[in-house]
Amino acid sequence: NLIGDAWVPIGPAPIPNGQVAAGPSTAVSGRVISIAVHPTNPNIVYAGTAQGGLYRTINGGTTWTPIMDNAQSLAIGAIAISPSSPETVYVGTGEPNFSGDSYFGVGVYRIDNASTTATLNGPFNLDAGAANIFSGRAIGKIIVHPTNPAVIFVCSTSGVGGIISASGTTPSRGIYRCDNA
């Protein structure tokens, strides 16, 4: 057997009216940008889409449920599950695959009780000086500290749409750390 000769599509299923440019009755699922698998239950998987939000399956992909429909941005760039507290999931908004139809984000969301009731918190996007550093950008990667789920590292990429810090400068792309997420 060759690696990859038995791939099976598992979703998320096409979204009716998901792409306005293609017409009002076109069913699409969009680009899936990121994926994360629960560290102890492989049937729980999270999938982040370019403009459809975050989806969760609890049955290995048989069915998918959107769990971020009330977020300010449905463009998902990164997903990270806390290794020490897998009910805590961090989601970075903004599509890091910069192209003509990419969407920027508004920061990082934390989802508590992620595999059940999925309580959405955020977006978290302010620096120590209360400047909004992630709106108009994309979050391309999130790493959660292995033993402390409140410590996260975020890679911010692309776009600078209207972001000005308290000092009047545009924040740099790069790696950011938060100790109280």
Question: Which residues does each PLM region occupy?
Answer:
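Extracellular glycan-interacting surfaces
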Residues: 1-181
